[in-house]
Swiss-Prot record:
Keywords for this protein: Hypotensive agent, Metalloenzyme inhibitor, Metalloprotease inhibitor, Protease inhibitor, Pyrrolidone carboxylic acid, Secreted
Main location: secreted
Name assigned to this protein: Bradykinin-potentiating peptide POL-236
Tissue and organ distribution: Expressed by the venom gland.
Amino acid sequence: QLWPRPQIPP
């Protein structure tokens, strides 16, 4: 199952 990866700010 795929889950949304946490958005890491640049």
